[in-house]
Structures are given as structure tokens and as C-alpha cells.
Design a protein with these regions (language model features):
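Primary detection of the long, small/polar-rich alpha-helical "axial" segments characteristic
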Residues: 1-487
């Protein structure tokens, strides 16, 4: 209360001024909330709420950038997929060229022309691999390895991707071939001949030590392993079957065949012996001459799976296309002997023997072989690349068909991987959008102003301000009346 009659101190006016100042601050705060839509625009408004809001804001910014990163990744992968599609189309053309060249009806000039076309096509495959880029980053030359896409707001929220080298020199058939019987898998041979018949199977310098059973394993560079126990009597077909049983997880396939070339000499009674393929019944052969011998063997092919052919030199070739062992037993007339250094013998006596075959492991990707030396397999596959195909000969064209087959398989596998990754990124984008929506909602709860409530509070503050001004005016009226007493 002011001192009566004082014109120097007006407590009522001071109270009114203080109230007006407080209401003015409230007005400013409420007007700021209305103009910005935020109840927290600085730490002064609500320190704890401000910290929470900043945390949500940081998370939301990270999510927004992660969505952008993922969309960029999708664009990159679409670029790589488009290039792979072009390469696959070119390799399909190479397949047609190889099949055409394998027909055997081409002249030497036509074969050379086909090889020229093949060279151009393989060069185009390599050109696509070396020139495909995204933002100056090479995608298909093998350098795009273990690249991380940051697809989340936090550390470690990444998707990793590698794209192999798809140049013509880097794709094709990865293979390892073994000829059974090359390393200690048969007994010392008996080269005797007699009037009653003999069988001479073997090769110069053939091993005579006892075979030790082993487990051969194979591991693909793309992951996945398989193994098979190999015994002394194992056929190439059984090894191939074991390999193919795991091809779904390893990508490694196997082909088996058994073939042996023999010199056939008729005895006093022509040829008399028994012939059997692994798992088939024994067939008795009684032939007067080599021509009759071939006819009889081929007549039993449906049972034994063994075919016979005579070459221009008179050599007899026996083939079991599935890689089953060829068992020759009970020779009583005539003689058979391997030519050259064909190392395909399991065991021999004067009158019987078993011929093992070859098994070839093959894949579009590289692979390693454990204990492979026990059956003649190398420790790692050898690449027969698309760049090395030669379709100028029928034999080369047939090899090219297989190389092209696995080159296509490799490209298709890469395309499948690239096709799956954009789907993963798209799913991640959808999840991030949902997360961003929820974080935005939570941020709004923390910092957004309640406009109806703020409007009501502002109206109240404005009324209080008007009342304060009226009170201030009233409190100064009495002070002014004292001045009328002055003379």
C-alpha cells in the first residue's frame, strides 16, 4: 500500500506493472507456440522434454537418410542387373554358335568364321563387365566386394553385397577330373598270354601299392560342402552320385564315364569271356572275330550299359557312359590288352580285370577338394573360361557347349542374388517408413503445441493484460489528484 499523500511511491502501480510484465511474458510464450506450432522450441521451455525431442529428431533424420541410402542401393543393383541381362543375352548367342559349330557339317572357312563371331561375343561380355559403373564405381569387374549399404539409423545396420567378376576370362566351367586307377588302386598286373586266353590291363609305371580307403570332400567357394567315402572297388558313377546329391547346397556337379581302349586278338576259338557293368548281370560273350565281338557287346548294352566300337586301327573301345566299372572275367579264348598308357585298371589276373572310369567335378564357381589326391583329383578346381573357348573344331565346340552352360549358370546365379537384394532393400525401406511414421508421431506428442489449449490460454492472458493496464491506470489517478493541492 502506498504511503498516504505520497507522490514518490505508488505500491499499487508497481504491483500492476509486475503483473503486466508476467502476463506479457506468458503472452510471448503462447504466441510463440501458436506461430511455431511447438510447445518446446528451446531447452528453457522444458529441459527434459527438449532432450527427448532432440533424440527423436536425430533418429528421424537418420531413418530418412537410411531410406535414401537404400533407394540408392536399389538403383545401383538395377544397373548391375541390367548389365547382367545383357551379358546373359550375349552368352546365349555363344551357346547357339557352339551348338552350330558342333554339328560337324561346317567347312574350315565356316568354322573359322564361327570362331571369329565367338571371339567378338566373348569380348563383348568382357566389355560389359569392365564398363558397367554406378557413380564411377565398377560393378562387374570383381572389385565390388563386401560393399556395405547403411540401411538403418544406427551403427551396424547394414546390408553387405559382393558381385563377382563377370568378364569372359572369369566365368565358365570350374572342373577337376580324376581317372580312377592312377594312384595305387590296383594290384601288379600280369602281362602273360596263353592259348587259353589272357587279359592285359594297365599302364607303364602303374602303382602297385595297396589302396587306402579315404573320404574325399569338396567345398564350393560359394559355401556348402560335401563328402564321400572312397573304397578300392569304388566306381566313378558312385562318386558322381555322391557329388550330385549335394549339388543343391554346393553348386558342384559331377559327370562320370568309363572308357578303355584295347587291342583285341582272337584265340583259337575266337573270343570267349564274360562282361559286366557295375550293378548289372553278367553277360557271356562268344564271338568269332572282332566285328562279331562288337556286335555281341552292343547287343547287351541294354543290360550292361557298355558299348563297343572299333577304330580305324582296329582297336576296341569299351564305354560305360554312366561311369560304372567294366568287369571282364573268365577269358578262355582270345586276349585283350590296353593300348598306350591308359591308366584305368583296378585289378587284373590272366583272365579277369576291372576297369574304373573318370569322374569330373564341375561348377560355375571355384571349389576345393580335400583328399582328392587319393583318387587323382587336384586340390582345387581349374577354370575353363568363356574367353578360351574354341569352336573351330567339333571337339572344341562340344567343350564350349559345356563351358557356356556353366558360364550361364554363374551369370544366372549372380542375377538371382542381385534380384533378391533389391527385394530385401525394398522390404527394409517399407520397414523404415513405418518406423519413421511412429517416431514422427512420438516426436509430435513430446513437442507439438496443443493449439486449442494454447489459444484459450492466450485469450486468458490477453484479458489479464487488459485488466492489469486498467488497474495501473486507476492506481495512478490518486497520485495525480495530490497535484491539485499545489498552489
Amino acid at each position: 500500500m502506498s504511503a498516504i499523500g505520497s507522490i514518490l511511491t505508488n505500491t499499487g502501480a508497481l504491483d500492476s506493472l509486475n503483473a503486466i510484465s508476467n502476463v506479457s511474458n506468458t503472452n510471448n510464450t503462447l504466441e510463440s507456440e501458436l506461430s511455431t506450432g511447438l510447445s518446446i522450441s528451446s531447452p528453457a521451455n522444458n529441459p527434459a522434454g527438449y532432450i527427448t525431442a532432440q533424440g527423436f529428431t536425430s533418429q528421424l533424420n537418420g531413418i530418412t537418410q537410411a531410406i535414401s541410402n537404400a533407394n540408392t542401393g536399389v538403383s545401383l543393383l538395377q544397373t548391375a542387373q541390367g548389365a547382367l541381362t545383357q551379358q546373359i543375352g550375349v552368352v546365349q548367342q555363344l551357346n547357339s554358335i557352339a551348338v552350330q559349330a558342333a554339328n560337324g557339317t561346317q567347312t574350315s572357312q565356316e568354322a573359322a568364321s564361327l570362331q571369329g563371331v565367338a571371339n567378338q561375343l566373348t569380348s563383348q561380355v568382357s566389355t560389359i563387365a569392365s564398363q558397367t559403373q554406378f557413380n564411377n564405381i565398377n560393378l562387374l569387374d570383381g572389385s565390388f566386394s563386401n560393399v556395405q549399404f547403411q540401411v538403418g539409423a544406427n551403427e551396424g545396420q547394414t546390408i553387405s553385397l559382393s558381385i563377382g567378376n563377370t568378364s569372359a576370362a572369369s566365368i565358365g566351367l570350374n572342373a577337376s577330373k580324376a581317372s580312377f586307377g592312377t594312384t595305387g588302386v590296383y594290384n601288379s598286373k600280369d602281362n602273360a598270354s596263353s592259348a587259353s586266353g589272357a587279359l592285359t590291363l594297365g599302364a607303364p609305371g602303374a602303382a602297385t601299392g595297396a589302396f587306402t580307403a579315404a573320404t574325399v570332400s569338396w567345398t564350393s567357394n560359394n559355401g556348402g560342402t560335401g563328402s564321400a567315402a572312397v573304397t578300392k572297388n569304388e566306381s566313378a558313377a558312385s562318386i558322381a552320385s555322391a557329388v550330385n546329391a549335394t549339388s543343391g547346397s554346393t553348386g558342384v556337379q559331377a559327370q562320370a564315364t568309363t572308357s578303355v581302349t584295347l587291342t583285341a586278338t582272337a584265340g583259337a576259338s575266337g573270343f570267349a569271356f564274360s562282361l559286366q557293368g557295375s550293378g548289372s548281370s553278367k553277360q557271356t560273350i562268344n564271338a568269332q572275330n572282332v566285328s562279331d565281338l562288337v556286335q555281341q557287346i552292343n547287343g547287351d548294352t541294354g543290360t550292361t550299359g557298355i558299348t563297343a566300337a572299333i577304330d580305324s586301327s582296329g582297336n576296341l573301345t569299351l564305354t560305360q557312359s554312366q561311369g560304372q566299372n567294366i568287369n571282364i572275367t573268365g577269358i578262355t579264348s582270345g586276349s585283350l590288352a590296353t593300348t598306350g598308357s591308359t591308366p584305368k585298371v583296378l585289378s587284373t589276373t590272366n583272365a579277369s580285370g576291372t576297369v574304373q572310369g573318370q569322374v569330373q567335378l564341375q561348377s560355375s564357381a571355384g571349389f576345393k577338394v580335400g583328399n582328392g589326391s587319393d583318387i587323382g583329383l587336384g586340390s582345387a578346381s581349374t577354370l575353363h573360361s568363356l574367353a578360351s573357348i574354341n569352336v573351330s573344331t567339333v571337339a572344341g565346340a562340344n567343350e564350349a557347349i559345356n563351358v557356356v552352360k556353366f558360364a550361364l549358370q554363374g551369370l544366372n546365379n549372380a542375377g538371382g542374388q542381385l534380384g533378391a537384394t533389391p527385394q530385401r532393400l525394398t522390404a527394409n525401406i517399407n520397414n523404415l517408413n513405418t518406423t519413421a511414421e511412429n517416431v514422427t508421431s512420438a516426436l509430435g506428442v513430446v513437442q507439438d503445441a496443443n493449439i486449442p489449449q494454447v489459444s484459450n490460454q492466450l485469450t486468458q492472458a490477453q484479458i489479464q493484460a487488459q485488466a492489469g493496464v486498467a488497474a495501473l491506470k486507476s492506481s495512478t489517478t490518486l497520485q495525480q489528484s495530490y497535484l491539485s493541492l499545489l498552489p
